[in-house]
């Protein structure tokens, strides 16, 4: 047993416990916060400090007490950290929304980084020896689910088996050349429109021969090959049938195709129970196959036979779920517990203390804002989940976890630790299902961290952690795992960065399915504003997406700014909304050095005093022109007073923002500060803005605006 150490209070105030989103605005981390080192160890680095509780490291659960004692002898410091931190509670606190404290700095010290990269990852837990010391009773009980299935038939009818276990080495080598080396174009093979569901789908297959798993399709989950314990839990909670939308979505998910699904509203959370069901089904099938093959190998050994059964990757974790906040993580873990059928959950109290906070933003804020920032909106976490036949362990070591849930920034700080000796990425080498949920929130934080994670995903490990190479699949050894990894992406609305995750960074040979909402002129955002205000869409020429920022900037300073006062009916109350922070800096510098405009500028980095002062001066007319960024609006959702003319330097990525920005003018009209007929909204766009344009004007109008001869369109 590990020695017991007396825990000390770290003396950090409750106000310092709150971690905000300031870090996510920066690509790199900078200065240290000495006063919060211990606190950050305790709360913010939620990454598996329980080495003394979890040292089997096997892809099945075997409790080896002797191995635990040996492992802990060399880890006194880790054990000390564990005991100091494991039961410190994060008390519910009063959350102030819309203040600078909500966007606190997350600059961590070196010792903080040590905690991320060390305590949860560097634990040697005999990874790879997963077929030793297996309880044969456990094998039998695990196999009970499939007593009625014929093993040979299952290989041809179960997408899990056909996707991961049937592809030949020659086939994968051929596809690797076409997909990864030659970058051959993927083929669009099917387009479907579901008018009653208001969505459409597009199916793409890789060049050459697709994997072609058995494409099961049914409105009943019982007709899919789902583990009994998961199916029973799901049907007990949600019934035996599926809605038309659920059936349409679950089909490509269970058939191991990549999926990009836009759920349109935060209120639509049905998709979450579908992907958690799939994740659990995948974990339990992987475990079941390993147990059965281990039994076969033991039997063959007794009979002096030689068998080659490959059923594993380099490391145990098979599912990675990326989420924006601890509250989102809490909800997903609760869903996993609900569907897993586990009788007990280890470290559940600690998890609740660190991930759950009963807090909601003010009722005056929009509903989507209140949902995004409710509960514990700390964006720095990383936690492993380990399943046994009857229990779930939270805070398991990464190398002994089945599922890892993490924020992109929390994970990237482990992958790219400033101390190169402590960088770790091996635990991501064998991820077979990647799930990215609430992508729009993650993008508003910092999408660069997602790109960092993708860079290390399915990378051949630096060390092999005692892996049994006789059990590792050849496509893992040959660095072909990314060809079989499934990627599931869920977002409220599509953006180029999110679209790129499936289009350019996923290579699943089973194919890709992209779902898109059908937005016509009737249900478009423009039609829901409720104000008959002049809206002018001005198109400018842009030769490529890479040249688009420069083309937009040149058009703005040469065509829009010089005529701004002439086209506007008012000399004051001019707001320029700029989605990109880099474009914002560029325009701000030009206004400062090359014009005589009396202007103010506020962004997500502005202090609270500057935000208040600038808004007051703009509302009073002292400042004639105001620069305003999209990320500031996302994090604060201000209602700016005094707006009479609105210039959108670019279209907002969130269509709701379009309505909210235009209603700034409606507020001025209501206060009789301007005339509705004289107010003006002008939007700059290019043909590369088609995705954002569709969300605002509809699928029918967007192609016309992007491709017709006319460059200017007016709507009311």
From Swiss-Prot:
Main location: nucleus
Localization of this protein: Nucleus, Nucleolus
Compositionally biased region (Basic and acidic residues): 15-26
GO CC list: nucleolus; small-subunit processome
Alphabetized GO MF terms: rRNA binding; U3 snoRNA binding
Keyword match Ribonucleoprotein: yes
Function per UniProt: DEAD-box RNA helicase-like protein required for pre-18S rRNA processing, specifically at sites A0, A1, and A2.
Family named by the database record: Belongs to the UTP25 family.
Subunit annotation: Component of the ribosomal small subunit (SSU) processome composed of at least 40 protein subunits and snoRNA U3.
Protein name (record): U3 small nucleolar RNA-associated protein 25
Organism: Candida albicans (strain SC5314 / ATCC MYA-2876) (Yeast)
Species lineage: Eukaryota, Fungi, Dikarya, Ascomycota, Saccharomycotina
């Amino acid at each position: 047993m590990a020695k017991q150490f007396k825990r000390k209070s770290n003396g950090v105030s409750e106000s310092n416990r709150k971690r905000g989103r300031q870090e996510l605005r920066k690509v790199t981390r900078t200065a240290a916060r000495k006063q919060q080192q211990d606190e950050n160890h305790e709360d913010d680095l939620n990454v598996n400090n329980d080495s003394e509780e979890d040292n089997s490291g096997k892809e099945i659960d075997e409790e080896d007490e002797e191995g635990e004692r040996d492992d802990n002898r060399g880890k006194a410091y880790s054990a000390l950290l564990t005991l100091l931190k494991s039961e410190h509670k994060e008390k519910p606190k009063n959350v102030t929304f819309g203040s600078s404290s909500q966007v606190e700095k997350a600059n961590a010290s070196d010792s903080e980084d040590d905690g991320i990269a060390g305590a949860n990852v560097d634990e040697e837990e005999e990874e790879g020896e997963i077929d030793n010391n297996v309880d044969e009773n456990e094998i039998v009980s695990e196999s009970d689910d499939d007593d009625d299935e014929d093993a040979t038939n299952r290989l041809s009818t179960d997408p899990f088996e056909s996707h991961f276990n049937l592809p030949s080495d020659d086939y994968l080598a051929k596809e690797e050349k076409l997909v990864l080396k030659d970058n051959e174009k993927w083929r669009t093979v099917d387009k479907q429109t579901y008018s009653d569901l208001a969505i459409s789908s597009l199916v793409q297959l890789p060049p050459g021969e697709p994997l072609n798993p058995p494409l099961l399709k049914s409105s009943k989950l019982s007709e899919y090959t789902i583990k009994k314990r998961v199916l029973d839990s799901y049907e007990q909670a949600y019934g035996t049938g599926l809605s038309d939308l659920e059936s349409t979505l679950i089909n490509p998910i269970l058939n191991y195709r990549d999926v990009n699904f836009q759920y349109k509203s935060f209120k639509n959370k049905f998709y979450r129970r579908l992907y958690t069901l799939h994740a659990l089904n995948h974990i339990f099938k992987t475990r079941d196959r390993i147990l059965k093959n281990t039994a076969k190998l033991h039997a063959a050994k007794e009979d002096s036979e030689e068998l080659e059964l490959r059923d594993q990757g380099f490391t145990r974790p098979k599912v990675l779920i990326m989420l924006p906040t601890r509250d989102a993580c809490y909800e997903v873990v609760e869903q996993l517990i609900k569907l897993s059928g586990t009788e007990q959950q280890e470290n559940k109290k600690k998890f609740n203390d660190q991930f759950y906070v009963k807090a909601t933003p003010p009722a005056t804020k929009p509903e989507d804002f209140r949902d995004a920032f409710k509960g514990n909106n700390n964006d720095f976490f990383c936690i492993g989940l380990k399943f046994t036949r009857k229990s779930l362990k939270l805070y398991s070591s990464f190398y002994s976890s089945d599922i890892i849930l993490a924020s992109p920034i929390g994970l990237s700080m482990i992958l790219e630790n400033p101390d190169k000796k402590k960088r770790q990425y091996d635990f991501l080498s064998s991820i077979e299902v990647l799930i990215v949920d609430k992508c729009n929130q993650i993008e508003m934080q910092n999408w660069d961290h997602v790109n960092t994670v993708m860079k290390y995903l399915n990378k051949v490990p630096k060390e092999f952690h005692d892996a049994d190479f006789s059990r590792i699949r050849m496509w893992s050894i040959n660095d072909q795992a990314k060809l079989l990894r499934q990627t599931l992406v869920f977002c409220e609305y599509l953006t180029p960065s999110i679209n790129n995750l499936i289009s350019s960074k996923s290579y699943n040979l089973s194919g890709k399915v992209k779902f898109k909402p059908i937005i016509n002129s009737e249900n478009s955002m423009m039609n829901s504003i409720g104000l008959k205000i002049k809206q002018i869409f001005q198109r400018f020429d842009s030769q490529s997406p890479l040249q688009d920022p420069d083309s937009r900037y040149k058009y703005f300073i040469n065509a829009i700014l010089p005529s701004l006062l002439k086209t506007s009916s008012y000399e004051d109350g001019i707001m320029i909304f700029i989605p990109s922070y880099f474009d914002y800096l560029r325009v701000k510098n030009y206004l400062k050095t090359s014009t005589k405009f009396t202007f103010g500028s506020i962004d997500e980095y502005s202090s609270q005093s500057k935000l208040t002062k600038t808004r007051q001066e703009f509302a009073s007319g002292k400042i004639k022109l105001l620069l305003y960024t999209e990320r500031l609006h996302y994090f604060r959702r201000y209602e700016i007073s005094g707006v009479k003319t609105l210039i959108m330097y670019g279209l907002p990525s969130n269509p709701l923002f379009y309505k909210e920005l235009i209603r700034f003018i409606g507020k001025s009209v209501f206060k009789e500060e301007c005339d509705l007929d004289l107010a003006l909204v002008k939007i700059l766009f290019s043909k590369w803005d088609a995705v954002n344009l569709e969300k605002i004007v509809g699928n029918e109008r967007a192609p016309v605006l992007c491709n017709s001869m006319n460059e200017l369109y007016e709507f009311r």
